[in-house]
Regions:
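Glycine-rich phosphate/pyrophosphate-binding loops
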Residues: 114-137
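Electrostatically charged, flexible surface regions
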Residues: 135-176
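Glycine/threonine-rich flexible loop motifs
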Residues: 95-104
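Hydrophobic/aromatic beta-strand patches that form the interior of the parallel beta-sheet core
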Residues: 30-32, 61, 88, 119-123, ...
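Glycine-rich beta-alpha junction loops
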Residues: 36, 127, 166-170
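Active-site metal-binding loops of divalent metal-dependent hydrolases
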Residues: 9
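Hydrophobic/aromatic ligand-binding patch that stacks against planar heteroaromatic rings
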Residues: 109-113
Length: 176
């Protein structure tokens, strides 16, 4: 699959790196992420000025705008060689549940993907004992289940993205 990855924690975040590392083993991965932290920016888009996009390495770009700007830029410009089959946002530092979803740039990027007609999933990792570890465990879960998760994203009728939240544990017993 051709997958576009982004987030709201910024290009250098541990969650994005873990997700990219796992998914690139089986899929074509393209990354465009904010050049800095844009947490809680919601569905903001940049108006009245151009976003700066910088190629960091092959198939990896930073953008001076918001997570939604990243998705729009990737889809509306000519930087991607192909339209992605799915958009993945995260892995976010901290959960995105309840009203958090309204403020979350992570969720907004996935929402924008669905608006553009592409199945999308947001991933978030919740702190345990004030620690945030094990991004690789959630990234591994994402890699093993990405096809199923993207099938649950309804881009036609309901216009919904999938929002995955997990505790920062060294392993998972299952899902619900």
């Amino acid at each position: 699959m051709n997958l576009l990855l982004t987030n709201d924690d910024g290009y250098g975040s541990e969650g994005l790196s873990a997700l990219a590392q796992k998914l690139s083993q089986k899929h074509n991965v393209f990354i465009i992420a904010p050049d800095g932290n844009r947490s809680a920016i919601s569905h903001g888009i940049t108006m009245y000025k151009k976003n700066r996009v910088k190629l960091v390495e092959k198939n990896v770009w930073t953008c001076s705008g918001t997570p939604v700007d990243c998705v729009i830029t990737a889809l509306k410009s000519n930087i991607l060689p192909i339209r992605p089959d799915g958009i993945l946002s995260g892995i976010n530092k901290g959960a995105n549940l309840g009203t958090d979803i309204v403020y979350s740039g992570t969720c907004a990027a996935a929402r924008e993907g669905v608006i553009e007609g592409i199945p999308s999933v947001a991933f978030s990792l919740e702190y345990v004992d004030n620690k945030l570890e094990y991004f690789d465990v959630l990234a591994d879960f994402a890699s093993k289940n990405i096809e199923k998760l993207l099938m649950c994203s309804d881009v036609q009728k309901e216009k919904t993205f999938v929002n995955v939240n997990a505790f920062s544990y060294p392993k998972y017993k299952g899902i619900r």
